[in-house]
From Swiss-Prot:
SUPFAM superfamilies: LexA/Signal peptidase (SSF51306), Winged helix' DNA-binding domain (SSF46785). Belongs to the peptidase S24 family. The keyword GTP-binding does not apply. Residues 28-48 bind DNA. This is LexA repressor. The active site is at residues 119, 156. Its EC number is 3.4.21.88. GO terms for molecular function: DNA binding; serine-type endopeptidase activity. The record marks 84-85 as: Cleavage. It comes from Pectobacterium carotovorum subsp. carotovorum.
Amino acid sequence: MKVLTARQQQVYDLIRDHIAQTGMPPTRAEIAQQLGFRSPNAAEEHLKALARKGVIEIVSGASRGIRLLMEEETGIPLVGRVAAGEPLLAQEHIECRYQVDPAMFKPSADFLLRVSGMSMKNIGIMDGDLLAVHKTEDVRNGQIVVARIDDEVTVKRLKKQGNTVHLLAENEEFAPIVVDLRQQSFSIEGLAVGVIRNSDWS
């Protein structure tokens, strides 16, 4: 399983878009110019990294010798820090993409969140793990959800009663978060559908 850095994803996207628009891949010089690299050699280093990860093939002896080996859609985006008031899946929040089949999860995963803290440790969700999330607002009491409260994003077990929502931790050291829907902004960003251990990617 492969992960692209944000810069590698930029290079990959540029190659894909250039092929879509012109029918041929860009030269190293064109990549360097488009992305602000100092020289074509810098572009070459990124191409070699993409080739090592198996997402492109470099054809030797040709200035445009680049062939794509994967489609972007196979990558699940990892969402980083989210600024207040902005959509969770805004492009600027996507740190990288993990080459994992979304259909591994039921329902399928739309994005990944890096878990921060140990509030859900009792059900095996640990600090640094990647939480696979299905984007939906259709959730039921008792499910593990990704919720946004006044622009803070958290992962907890849902319990809703009337105008009050209790977000329950799976760690006795953490008190429930109580949300008054009449006074606080609250939304469901998605349903947790699986966990990828942090050590799986080391």
